[in-house]
Amino acid sequence: MRALIFGRFQPFHKGHLSIVKWAFERGYSELVFLVGMASENYTPRNPFTAGERIEMIRLSFLDAGLPLEKAITATIRTLETSIGSVYYVLSYVPRVDTILTRNPVIAKIFLDAGVNVERPPLFNRDEWRGEKIRMWIARGDDRWRSTVTPSTARFIEEIGGVERIRWSLASD
């Protein structure tokens, strides 16, 4: 079985990685990561490019000892939320059996389009949340490092992600 995980992944963090592990435990053999809002980057809400987010997914898989061949990545531009978007999304990814989402609007439009939806559990949502991680990075709070895998933290630093987030929030 193949599942779709649709997200912004700003950044890809341990909450996302926990959903990956949960999905494999549930019997999904492959996961398709659709990196949303691919056309927006260098903003406070979306500081990383689509390519950088794909790299974070790959690094997180490697750090966790998960097989890369079980991950398929795709990107999609920023879309309005509508039932028509479901068909557009599905045309950008390989066939999937299910979408894994906690977003009730996304779940509803995919259900209405006839796609199976499964709601993953929350994993340490108090800390593993993109908005909070970006806030910690902006404030110079090193707690952000514990929310992503070691290779992802190094990657964020190597690409100037810390400075980028601080700059984007200062200019907002």
Curated annotation (Swiss-Prot):
State a single Gene Ontology molecular function.
nicotinamide-nucleotide adenylyltransferase activity
Which Gene Ontology BP terms does the record give? Answer: NAD biosynthetic process
The record's section on SUPFAM superfamilies has:
Nucleotidylyl transferase
Keywords for this protein: Nucleotidyltransferase, Transferase
Q: Name one GO cellular component term.
A: cytoplasm
Q: Name one Pfam family in it.
A: CTP_transf_like
* Similarity comment: Belongs to the archaeal NMN adenylyltransferase family.
Specify the protein name.
Uncharacterized protein APE_1986.1
Q: Record the organism.
A: Aeropyrum pernix (strain ATCC 700893 / DSM 11879 / JCM 9820 / NBRC 100138 / K1)
